UniProtKB/Swiss-Prot annotation:
PANTHER family in the record: BAG FAMILY MOLECULAR CHAPERONE REGULATOR 1, BCL2-ASSOCIATED ATHANOGENE
Species whose genome carries this gene: Schizosaccharomyces pombe (strain 972 / ATCC 24843) (Fission yeast)
Single annotated GO MF: adenyl-nucleotide exchange factor activity
Segments for region (Disordered): 78-98
Keyword field: Chaperone
SMART domains listed in its UniProt record: BAG
Lineage per the UniProt record: Eukaryota, Fungi, Dikarya, Ascomycota, Taphrinomycotina
CDD domains: Ubl_ubiquitin_like
Protein name: BAG family molecular chaperone regulator 1A
Functional description taken from the UniProt entry: Inhibits the chaperone activity of HSP70/HSC70 by promoting substrate release.
Gene, per the UniProt record: bag101
Complex and partners: Binds to the ATPase domain of HSP70/HSC chaperones.
Length: 195
């Protein structure tokens, strides 16, 4: 048996399971390890990595793109209705993401930051950019405050793990870009007023 020198984290609902693996082992072996070492009991789980469903059970983990410290999403398959035949079709990752509470929670975190920026920081930002104070000390204080609050939101976004999801990565990137533009505009305004 090969030495298991790498670790992957399985995200299953709101639970996290670190699993020791050898990246040369097959997906089938990983699933067997999951059943042995975790509370996951369903043999027919669906695994997703980087937004793609892992289906080829004979492929090695490294061939599937997994690395040390990779995060894998594990979901239960929906129970089949009576009389329907189980089909081995590729399920698009976005649908799986929309149904998974982990992805919903992460999307909610991103949206909460966006709402905070819109409701709390945008009025301060607009006031500073459109009506900067004539008092240099007050203007500098406003700039430092709005810059600090915007940077805090960037740090929060940086801490949001999108689990390899392209959709969530895009949402986070859009919000980072929006906040960065606001910061750039604050800096530009302070330079124009100082000139």
């Amino acid at each position: 048996m090969s030495e298991k020198t790498s670790t992957v984290t399985i995200h299953y609902g709101n639970q996290r399971f670190p699993v020791a693996v050898n990246l040369n082992e097959t997906l089938s072996e990983l699933i067997d390890d999951l059943l042995e070492t975790t509370e996951i009991s369903e043999k027919k789980v669906k695994l997703f990595y980087a937004g793609k469903r892992l289906k080829d059970k004979k492929a090695s983990l490294s061939k599937l793109g997994l690395k040390n410290h990779s995060k894998i999403l594990c979901i239960r398959p929906h129970k089949q209705q009576r009389g329907s035949k189980e089909k081995d079709t590729v399920e698009p990752a976005p649908k799986a993401e929309a149904e998974n509470p982990v992805f919903s929670r992460i999307s909610g975190e991103i949206k909460a930051i966006d709402q905070y920026v819109d409701k709390e920081l945008s009025p301060m930002y607009d006031n500073y950019v459109n009506k900067p104070s004539n008092d240099p000390k007050q203007k500098n204080k406003q700039k430092l405050m709005i810059s600090e609050l915007l940077l805090q939101q960037l740090l929060k976004l940086d801490g949001v793990d999108v689990l390899g999801s392209e959709k969530l990565r895009f949402e986070r990137k859009q919000l980072v870009s929006k906040i960065q533009k606001m910061l750039d505009h604050v800096d530009q305004t302070s330079q124009e007023v100082a000139a």
